[in-house]
Amino acid sequence: MAQLGGAANRAPTASLAPTSQSLRCAPQPRPSRADTGSLGRYWGKAAAAASREHPFPGTLMHSAAGSGRRRGALRELLGLQRAAPAGWLSEERAEELGGPSGPGSSRLCLEPREHAWILAAAEGRYEVLRELLEAEPELLLRGDPITGYSVLHWLAKHGRHEELILVHDFALRRGLRLDVSAPGSGGLTPLHLAALQGHDMVIKVLVGALGADATRRDHSGHRACHYLRPDAPWRLRELSGAEEWEMESGSGCTNLNNNSSGTTAWRAASAVGATAVETSRRVAASRTKAKDTAGSRVAQMHSLFRHLFPSFQDR
């Protein structure tokens, strides 16, 4: 009986030991379909959101930093720290190391001071420009990212010849290299804009005092002298880059500036003169035609009389 009891006690112990056959026959746990579907929908939505975040490379860098933080928060909520794509981890690691304005990054957004500088330059407010330059002198080299105009372009456009001299002297004192003939949108230099707006003193300051290059051409191949008004003096044309043969032949007087009131009046007078000449020519032609018609009728009558009356003599 003791042996039977011992055998009975050993039998359950042996049955509890796992065997290869029992492992194969045991049911394996299956992943929940609901979990798989939710994860699939999550990754699909995350990929769609990532594709919509940056439709083109010029998107501001603030959205990139915010998207990285949002992705990290989503993974923390869903417990997917280990299942994040490698691309997301690399982007967030780069943001942590360098940030949107770190070394080697292409920061495209404007700082508040840069934004204020561009607005003040476009409006020609020198007092605001001077305060900003005292705080950050490097703003002098900052141009408008849309038009490509520097502060010299805007001052020349507004006719601020004294402010041009002050800005140039400030650049010399601070050791900043300021290009007086730098091209902007369309290849226009500050000298081109001064000629377009009819600011004679600005032209004299740019060429005579600041050493602007009067031979620079815009993208249409025109120098600043081609945008002067028709009644501009010859000395001003010479400063604006007109050559001797242009001044002698009079071709330098050709004005391409549509904003000039003198050009508009000259074109209107030319149009009126051309209309008057055309009207006179038509009247003279009609009179000549009438005379020819009358002469032909008289000749026909004379020939008729000669046939009817042979004794009729042409007198």
Curated annotation (Swiss-Prot):
Q: Which spans of this chain does UniProt mark as ANK repeats?
A: 112-141, 147-162, 186-216
Query: In its keyword annotation, does this UniProt entry include Nucleotide-binding?
Result: no
Respond yes or no to whether keyword Repeat is given for this record: yes
Q: Which cysteines are joined by disulfide bonds?
A: none
- Pfam families linked to this entry: Ank_2
Domain of life according to the entry: Eukaryota
Record keywords, A-Z: ANK repeat, Repeat
InterPro entries from the xrefs?
Ankyrin_rpt, Ankyrin_rpt-contain_sf
Using the UniProt annotation, give all residue ranges assigned to the region (Disordered). Answer: 1-39
Q: Which family does it belong to?
A: Belongs to the SOWAH family.
Q: What is this protein called?
A: Ankyrin repeat domain-containing protein SOWAHD
